[in-house]
Amino acid sequence: MIKLKDILNEVFDTNLLENNDDYRIFCDLDGVLVDFDKGVKQLTGGISFEDYVKTKGYDSLWSIINQNGSIWWSTLPWIADGHKLWSFIRNKDVTILTAGSTKNTGKLAIEGKKDWCLKNLSAIVPVIVTNNSHDKQQHAQPNHILIDDLPSNINEWKAKGGIGILHTTAEQTINELQQILRQ
């Protein structure tokens, strides 16, 4: 099977899309590239996800998110150091692996997240939107690296034989990726 990167490299006589074929990177969106929390604060008048859920309930927050439709998901801002991480991984064998959502936002989140990737990343970046975060582990293999900000996703990924990087900052994730890719 011919990969798009191979065709582009041949057409442009370049190795701009060079990657380490031994590894495939799966990168989460919310909390890694996208600032979900900032988006929630914009919807709730500055109240954080956690505080809003504590005071008004989980269902109330998801109701507000749903009222804003897929446009809310597609216009979420980049996380502060998201561009730095994306600049490092974009020319590697990378797939966006993100969860649709947990509270009745499935179709809206799927449409919005795919649109966000199209507008902010590239039309050629594969995007997989799972029904929930636990479904991410179905893509784990020994040479597959998951970058995710949720410890439970990393633990499930590793339990299925994949390599997991718990994302806290772009710098930390890049350092861990460099160590893995050097092996």
What are these regions (language model features)?
Residues 97-144, 151-154:
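Substrate-recognition "cap/lid" segment bordering the active-site pocket of phosphatases
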Residues 87-90, 114, 118, 155-158, ...:
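Class I S-adenosyl-L-methionine
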Residues 145-178:
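Acidic, Mg2+-coordinating phosphoryl-transfer loop and its flanking beta/alpha structural elements
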Residues 11-66, 159, 169:
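Active-site neighborhood of HAD-like aspartate-dependent phosphohydrolases
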